[in-house]
Each structure stands twice: as C-alpha cells, then as structure tokens.
Amino acid sequence: MSGDGLQAPYASPDPPGRDDWRTTFRPDIPSSARIYDYFLGGKDHFQADRDAADQIAAYLPNMREAARINRAFVRRAVRYLVSEAGIRQPIDIGAGLPTMGNVHEVATAAHPAAPGSYVALTHGTADAAPRARDAARVYDAATTRMFVRSRAEVLALARGLDAVEPGLVWTPEWHPEPGEQVPARPSDCYYYALAARKP
C-alpha cells in the first residue's frame, strides 16, 4: 500500500540484505536518478545504472525518447504555471539529478521574482505498454520503487486539485512548444502528464 491509499501491485519488497541501501552511496546499486540521467544523455551514472537502463529499454524501447519528452513537459509546465497561472513557488518532486533547464532556471526565466515552486505531475503507466510492469521491477531492484498506475489511479492522485487544460494527457500532448514534433503515438512515451493548482 502506498502513502496515497492506492494499491501498488507492481512493487516488490525492499531487496534482501539492503537495510542500508537508502543511506549509503552504492554505485554498484542502480539509482533511479542516475538511470534517468543516462536516458537523458547525461554523464552522472555508473555501469550498474547503465545496465539497469538497458534492461528497462528492452521492455520499453522508446524510454530514452520518453525521458526526454518527460523532461520537456516539466519545462513547459513550469513556464506555463509561472508566466500564465501566477504560480511563484514551483516544487519538483522526484526531480532526479540536476540537468540543464532545471525547474528554478525555467521559473526564473519566466518570472525573475519567482522563488521556484509549482504543481505538475508525470506518472509512468502500463495502460499502453504492459511491459512497463517488467521495467518497474528493474527499478524495484534498484534504489527506488517504481509504481506504474492506470489513468484512473493517476487522476485519483490529483483529486481535489484544479487541472490546467488540457487535463491529464500523454506527456508530448501537454502544451507542445511551437514547432515541437508530437509523436504519432503519444502513448509510446509511457507517461501521463498533468498540471494543476490547489484551489
């Protein structure tokens, strides 16, 4: 059971013998942040992260592109929420490692007085890619549990919030930049995207 009260059917228990795995730096154990860095073409990852990323990509062949599109959504959402919706304090939960176009950089560019906080969500799903459950198990063996949720479960996470148009959509469909190519099958990006504000 996750903290939101929803069943997390694809998560496994903590890996055996890893009582200290969350507090000790272990480059031999994959990290979700470093895996994401690898998918984004970054430099801050180790062989264990690359191996785990390759396993994930075997299940989800578009994962590198999905990570890039997911990151682009974060930038678009922050830019919109700061410049259009008046949000002044964006918060990026599960941000991964620092990379170009961080939330605070985008927020400051959109509104120089913005201290840096917003509500935007991307969430992995198996709705269009059942093998995402297998990829989630690779993350489970690393330092972070991965939960893939259905559209209804992601909407339940945002209950009580006012969604920004277009609501919950695939990441490349949320306010694409002018000239930005939206894939023919947006669901191949494996993530839902939503921006919302607390009423």
What are these regions (language model features)?
Residues 46-49, 128-132:
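Short acidic/His/Gly/Ser-rich catalytic and metal-binding motifs that mark active-site loops
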Residues 27, 145-146, 184-187:
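Short Gly/Pro-enriched turn/cap motifs at secondary-structure boundaries
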Residues 113-123:
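Conserved beta-strand signature within the Rossmann-like core of class I S-adenosyl-L-methionine
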Residues 91-92, 120-122, 165:
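A structural signal for short, well-ordered beta-strand segments and their strand-loop junctions
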Residues 1-112, 190:
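Rossmann-like AdoMet
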